[in-house]
């Protein structure tokens, strides 16, 4: 049996990291650094939900028309030509993500991607519990909602986008509530996940903590 340290540092080995956590907890930044450090393909699972939200908008499908959204989710194709990171798309994605049929359809895409990619870090809300329960390493990132809102605010400002901190905080709190209370794969850490609160940690400090965990993990 190959140990975790060997899988992580030997690029000839298959190695999968499941990285979960709430919105704006720092998953994206941390995931990208880990991907580079361990030569992993990085994939943000929220992109499939954001793409579906964008498709609903562009095709003028009301998100309350659940049957229409479910049908659209079966035909999803990722298109990198559009900005899927704005808050409106994120909020719509959060609304449709609570629908179990939609999650099942989109998870088929994600599960296949994990199975066919030898070295991958997939980031999302239910990767360690649903999409990749057999991942070699499961990490759950969290942080105080106020700090997460401030981080998102700075990110959006850096991109030249107009935003209001209080509104971002309200959206994050609402999204957390949806994620935790949904019947289909609610947001929670896997029982064997490494849980890290990033409220007072930089991205590099989190990466260092993960690296030390990998080096010291006894299989």
UniProtKB/Swiss-Prot annotation:
Its EC number is 2.7.4.25. ATP binds at residues 21-29. CDD domains: CMPK. Gene3D superfamilies: P-loop containing nucleotide triphosphate hydrolases. The keyword Kinase applies. Pfam families: Cytidylate_kin (PF02224). Signal peptide: none annotated. GO terms for molecular function: ATP binding; CMP kinase activity; dCMP kinase activity. One of its GO terms (cellular component) is cytoplasm. The keyword Repeat does not apply. Keywords: ATP-binding, Cytoplasm, Kinase, Nucleotide-binding, Transferase. It is an enzyme of class 2 (transferase). It catalyses: CMP + ATP = CDP + ADP; dCMP + ATP = dCDP + ADP. Its main location: cytoplasm. One of its GO terms (biological process) is pyrimidine nucleotide metabolic process. It is found in: Cytoplasm. Belongs to the cytidylate kinase family. Type 1 subfamily. This is Cytidylate kinase.
């Amino acid at each position: 049996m190959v140990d975790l340290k060997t899988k992580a540092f030997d690029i000839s080995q298959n190695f999968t990291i499941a990285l979960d956590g709430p919105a704006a907890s720092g998953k994206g930044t941390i995931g990208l650094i880990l991907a580079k450090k361990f030569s992993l393909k990085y994939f943000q699972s929220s992109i499939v939900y954001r793409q579906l939200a964008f498709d609903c908008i562009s095709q003028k499908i009301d998100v309350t028309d659940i049957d229409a959204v479910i049908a659209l989710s079966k035909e999803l194709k990722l298109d990198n030509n559009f900005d899927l990171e704005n808050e409106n798309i994120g909020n719509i994605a959060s609304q449709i993500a609570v629908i179990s049929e939609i999650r099942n359809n989109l998870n088929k895409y994600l599960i296949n991607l994990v199975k066919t990619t030898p070295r991958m870090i997939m980031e999302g809300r239910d990767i360690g519990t649903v999409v990749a329960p057999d991942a070699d390493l499961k990490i759950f990132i969290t942080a105080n909602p106020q700090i997460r809102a401030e981080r998102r605010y700075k990110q959006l400002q850096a991109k030249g986008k107009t935003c209001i901190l209080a509104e971002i905080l309200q959206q994050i709190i609402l999204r957390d509530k949806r994620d935790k209370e949904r019947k289909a794969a609610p947001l929670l850490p896997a029982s064997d996940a490494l849980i890290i609160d990033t409220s007072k940690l930089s991205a590099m400090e989190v990466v260092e903590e993960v690296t030390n965990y990998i080096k010291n993990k006894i299989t």
